[in-house]
Amino acid sequence: MTRIRRRKEANDQASPPRVWKVGKYIRLSRDDGNSESESIGNQRKILDQQIPGYFHGDYEIVREYIDDGRTGTSDDTRPEFLQLVEDVKKGKINCIITKNLSRAFRNSANQGKFLEEFIPLYNTRFISLYEPCIDTFLNPEVVHSLEVSITGFMNEQYAYKTSVDVRRTLDTK
């Protein structure tokens, strides 16, 4: 019995606790003309207040990725999101945190591919603080939930409806 205990103690010492390397993702689709949008500041404040409650060990805020004035309907038009993806691939980031799914995605297909394929492939933690709350480390199955899928479709429809309304307004001027 002693050998088992020693082996377990040796294994515990050999693998140090995981340090979460956090990337905060913040996005606003419309620029309000200021150097930094008010909503960007609000998202940052919310993330900074909530982050400590999600980690029961070491974590380090590596970087903020901010796409101000960028739509969430396409990944390839958001330079900071693309940089975040590259940093995950390079191992610089192993945890992404955002206010809610609509900040990261306004396209349900991209959302599904990212959460169901990319996140597990790179052994990365994804946290969405609100609507719906997601933590792929504590509850990996949540990405397959009906609530996450419906939220993705609702976010996509919101972007589409807003686009139609804006075009209609511009056409009447």
What are these regions (language model features)?
Residues 1-172:
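Short, structured surface patches at the beginning of a domain
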